[in-house]
Structures are given as C-alpha cells and as structure tokens.
Amino acid sequence: MTEMDDNHSLSVSRDADGVIVVHGDIDVAGGPILEAALSKTDGTRPVVIDLDDVFFIDSSGLRCLLGAGRRARDRGTSVVLRGVGSEVLRLLEITGTTDQFSIEHRNG
C-alpha cells in the first residue's frame, strides 16, 4: 500500500520484503506519512528504509528518522538507511547522527 501526502511531495510504500520505500522530500508536510509507515513496524527485526529517491530531509524529517532509530534500539534492533545519497548523508554528518543508523550508500 502506498501513502501519499496531499501535496504529493512524498510517497511511502512497502516492498515484498517489508522495506519502507520513500519517494520525495521528507519535510514537515510529508513527515507524518513516513511516521505512519514507521509506526506499523513490528519491532522484531531491523527497520529498513530505502531513501534512494530522497534528496531532501528537513529537521522534522530527521526527527522522524531519529525517533524510529530510538524505538528500534529500545526493542533491541536497528534502523538501516538504504540508498543514502550525498544530500542526505551531509545532513546526517552535519547533525552528528550518522551513528544512529546503519547506512548503505546509494549506488552510482
């Protein structure tokens, strides 16, 4: 199932392996859509978020990702950010939060 914000700047879906696939900007408008998808994780295995089609994350989007990481750690698991590009990596580095996630870089 795909969820989309009213401005169509963000869509979130799950693939067959349970990976949360994000398309668009994770900002104040789209953050609640991602938050809703993250709240549906069962907490028994790592949460994998595919960010290959994400080029912008604002502070509210970062808060959403950090909250997911905190909840995962509380349950004894982790959050994997897959397909992280230079724009998103820069935000994580500037904010000193790269250690909160397992990071898999974007190919190419």
State what each model feature region is.
Residues M1-F56, G67-G108:
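STAS-like cytosolic regulatory interaction modules
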